[in-house]
């Protein structure tokens, strides 16, 4: 047990170092710049150098802070992030020094709900850190983070309900075992879309990084933190990203099962190969995080709340109802439940994706667009020889005309 815990800790720390480096490299590539390239060959040691730099920095404690809560907040954020990984299955039963053991630290009948609860506990560190800093900007960042977790934790939990219905269990290992033939992403596509959006909001990442919006809150909840305390907040953020990515892999992408066509090989799901498939799937979701950060602007607070409460939560409730009805047909022996579920899943997911545009346009802007279209239709058509919009004179011509008028006067 202790060896597994140590292996998970080392796995997470190494992946955090690689994730920070790759994020900066990928952002540089997408923004047409080289990215970090100074420390080590091609900049591969940049993350390690940054970690050492943060460890050696001076610890500055602002005056007037609640010191106990101020120092405890990073720890409260970090511990649940690491603990949640104890319930993630990396692979099947393997032989380690002659001892047969599953590649999972532990499991529970309600493991997914336990992970959901741990992810919610992590927000306490953010809220307490913002409150204990004794500053306005961190406090606002903490309050935003609380509202964000409350809004998107509901949608995320509802996206799990359909998975529980078809897996027949809340255990992560049992859910992975239920996907040995068909991954749930093909049967429950709307649940995956809702979870994908919710996991980005849950981890406070772009375009949902409102608790640490630089243009509004300086650095958000960790404005007053430095040195190792800031590093712990950063570590918790990246470990949480890996936790929700691993959970998406376990719930929707077959966990450690090999993807097609590799699953045609007889030994693809035996030995240590499943660890490779699991890690590759997890890194696919991490790449989506980096891609979203490079592509999308930050949402306004009202847009973000509207997306969660007006779209994701109602859509989750409707989809759970549809999935439950189809599951009832399956239990009653209806033979064609699979094509009905797949077609319903595709249609509902397409409607959900098309509906994502509505929360990002406010009602008065939509009304203004309709009004402008009506007025444009009422305008008389101009002849082809005359431009619709008059071309203003160049600055040089305007100055010359003004000087002539002055000379005449």
Swiss-Prot record:
Taxonomic superkingdom: Bacteria
Main location: membrane
Subcellular location: Cell membrane
The keyword ATP-binding belongs to this UniProt entry's keyword annotation: no
Gene Ontology biological-process entries: aerobic respiration
Pfam families reported for this sequence: NADHdh
GO molecular function: NADH dehydrogenase activity; oxidoreductase activity, acting on NAD(P)H, quinone or similar compound as acceptor; quinone binding
Topology term for the membrane: Multi-pass membrane protein
PROSITE patterns in UniProt: COMPLEX1_ND1_1 (PS00667), COMPLEX1_ND1_2 (PS00668)
EC number, UniProt record: 7.1.1.-
Regions crossing the membrane: 2-22, 68-88, 108-128, 149-169, 182-202, 247-267, 272-292, 306-326, 334-354
GO CC terms in record: plasma membrane
Catalytic activity field: a quinone + NADH + 5 H(+)(in) = a quinol + NAD(+) + 4 H(+)(out)
InterPro entries xrefs: NADH_UbQ_OxRdtase_su1/FPO, NADH_UbQ_OxRdtase_su1_CS
Keywords assigned: Cell membrane, Membrane, NAD, Quinone, Translocase, Transmembrane, Transmembrane helix
Protein's UniProt keywords contain NAD: yes
Family: Belongs to the complex I subunit 1 family.
Functional summary from the UniProt entry: NDH-1 shuttles electrons from NADH, via FMN and iron-sulfur (Fe-S) centers, to quinones in the respiratory chain. The immediate electron acceptor for the enzyme in this species is believed to be menaquinone. Couples the redox reaction to proton translocation (for every two electrons transferred, four hydrogen ions are translocated across the cytoplasmic membrane), and thus conserves the redox energy in a proton gradient.
Subunit text: NDH-1 is composed of 14 different subunits. Subunits NuoA, H, J, K, L, M, N constitute the membrane sector of the complex.
Name this polypeptide is given: NADH-quinone oxidoreductase subunit H
Organism: Mycolicibacterium paratuberculosis (strain ATCC BAA-968 / K-10)
Gene that this polypeptide is encoded by: nuoH
């Amino acid at each position: 047990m202790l060896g597994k815990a140590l292996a998970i800790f080392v796995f997470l720390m190494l992946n955090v170092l690689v994730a920070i480096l790759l994020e900066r490299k990928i952002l540089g590539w997408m923004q047409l710049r080289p990215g970090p390239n100074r420390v080590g060959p091609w900049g591969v040691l940049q993350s390690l150098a940054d970690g050492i730099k943060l460890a050696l920095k001076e610890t500055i404690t602002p005056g007037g802070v609640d010191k106990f809560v101020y120092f405890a907040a990073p720890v409260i954020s970090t511990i649940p992030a690491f603990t949640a990984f104890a319930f993630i299955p990396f692979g099947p039963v393997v032989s380690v020094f002659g001892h047969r053991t599953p590649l999972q630290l532990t499991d529970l009948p309600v493991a997914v709900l336990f992970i959901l609860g741990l992810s919610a506990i992590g927000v306490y560190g953010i809220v307490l850190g913002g409150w204990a800093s004794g500053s306005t900007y961190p406090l606002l960042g903490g309050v935003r983070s609380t509202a964000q977790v409350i809004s998107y934790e509901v949608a995320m939990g509802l996206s799990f309900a359909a998975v529980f219905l078809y897996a027949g269990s809340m255990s992560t290992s049992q859910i992975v075992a239920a996907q040995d033939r068909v991954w749930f992403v093909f049967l429950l596509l709307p649940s995956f879309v809702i979870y994908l959006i919710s996991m980005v909001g849950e981890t406070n990442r772009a375009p949902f990084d409102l608790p640490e919006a630089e243009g509004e809150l300086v650095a958000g909840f960790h404005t007053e933190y430095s040195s190792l305390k800031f590093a712990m907040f950063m570590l918790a953020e990246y470990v949480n990203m890996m936790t929700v990515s691993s959970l998406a892999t376990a719930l929707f992408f077959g966990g450690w099962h090999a993807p097609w066509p590799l699953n045609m090989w007889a030994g693809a799901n035996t030995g240590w190969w499943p660890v490779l498939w699991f890690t590759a799937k997890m890194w696919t979701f991490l790449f989506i995080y980096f891609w979203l950060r490079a592509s999308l602007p930050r949402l306004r607070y009202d847009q973000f709340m509207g997306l969660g409460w007006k779209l994701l939560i109602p859509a989750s409730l409707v989809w759970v109802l549809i999935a439950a009805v189809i599951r009832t047909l399956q239990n009653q022996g209806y033979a064609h439940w699979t094509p009905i579920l797949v077609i319903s899943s595709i249609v509902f997911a397409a409607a959900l994706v098309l509906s994502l545009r509505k929360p990002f346009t406010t009602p008065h802007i939509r009304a203004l667009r309709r009004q402008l279209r009506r007025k444009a239709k009422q305008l008389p058509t101009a002849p082809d020889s005359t431009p619709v919009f008059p071309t203003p004179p160049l600055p040089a011509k305007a100055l010359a005309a003004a000087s002539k008028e002055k000379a005449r006067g």
